[in-house]
Amino acid sequence: MPLNSDKRAYRILISWTPASGGTEPIEYAAWLARTTPVEVRVLSAFVQPWHEVSMQKLGGKYNKWFAQEAKACKQAVKNTLRAAGIPREQWDKEYSVLMDGPSKPQLLTQAAEEFDADLVLLGPNQGAAKGRFLAGSTADSLLHYSPIPVGLSPRAAKLSKHGVTRLNFALTEEQGIDDVPALIDAAFLASTWNVPLRIIVFSSHGLVNAPINDNLDVALELTSQWREHSLGRLDIARERVGERFPDLEIRTEIGSGKGWRAAVDSLKWKKGDLICLGSSPMGALERVFIGWRATELLPHLSVPIIVWPSRKTS
């Protein structure tokens, strides 16, 4: 979510269809609705597999079928939003939209722009393990070009009834401490929602992970240098956030283990945790673009995620 200057509710576009295997993105939206005022709209995208000439031959038959699908989809969306506990006043007037086209990522981007969305929510590939996120083709595309922040939900995530209770920001090597805009965005949300901010550095190599034939002294020296470097980055991050948000509760931690799963699981996570990541810079383009480290990290995160587009420091 970007910084809202007009104080309006956060507009959330949810990617979901009744044929989806789960309701994770709608549950994610309901979780955010328990945290802050939101306005939600559900986009159900139908990808046309047929050539344009074939569509023209179908003519009115296709239009009639599409209208019937849109009506059925709207009823399913209505039932699911209610079941998730999102108050009716937080639904957009046009809360269910069915669109067709050759590309689902393009349809989502178009719909997000038309809705002036602050956030696009996507569910996991249903092949993901419970409590973990696995990107499908649509998520993978948006994570490499979306102009709008992208929210991702692990499969069957257990979320707090009290909404978001802590913001987390992950510093990766690609972004480093120079990724100030995304860090400041996370701090802004934490301050606005009156929740603490935890800034994290992850290492997937463990603090001591030397091969059998390596010199242990060298490994220990490298580990010591990495830890000192990481603590320095965390101190700078804490200082920069503290200057902008002096009343915000800020903690810093290092998650380390042999592999990303162990690094993530080395830290304590709560049902109210939301983790945020920035994007690797793409010149003048303000787009979501995750680097290889973030790509490796995502499948092991067990809490909802927001990935911000890169942008210049304001």
PLM-predicted stretches and their roles:
Residues P2-K61, T165-L220, G242-R251, H300, ...:
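Small/aliphatic-rich secondary-structure junction motif
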